[in-house]
Structure formats: C-alpha cells, structure tokens
Swiss-Prot record:
Subunit of the oligosaccharyl transferase (OST) complex that catalyzes the initial transfer of a defined glycan (Glc(3)Man(9)GlcNAc(2) in eukaryotes) from the lipid carrier dolichol-pyrophosphate to an asparagine residue within an Asn-X-Ser/Thr consensus motif in nascent polypeptide chains, the first step in protein N-glycosylation. N-glycosylation occurs cotranslationally and the complex associates with the Sec61 complex at the channel-forming translocon complex that mediates protein translocation across the endoplasmic reticulum (ER). All subunits are required for a maximal enzyme activity. It is a single-pass type III membrane protein. Residues 30-37 are cytoplasmic. The gene is OST4B. This is Dolichyl-diphosphooligosaccharide--protein glycosyltransferase subunit 4B. Residues 1-8 are lumenal. Belongs to the OST4 family.
Amino acid sequence: MFDDQDLGFFANFLGIFIFVLVMAYHFVMADVKYEGN
C-alpha cells in the first residue's frame, strides 16, 4: 500500500492542486465580472 512518505507527498500535491484550482477559478470569475461591466 502506501507508506508515510507516499501519503505525505500525495496530501501535499492534493493541497497544492486544490489551491491552484481555487486561485484559477477566482481569477477567471473576476475577469468575467470585470468584462461584464
């Protein structure tokens, strides 16, 4: 299965991926809102 190192790497990667996804979503929504005005 997984050892502690693999689990830590996966958790770290998942956290970074979610953070980037939220930032990208925020920038896209902000751009759409500004273009609407």
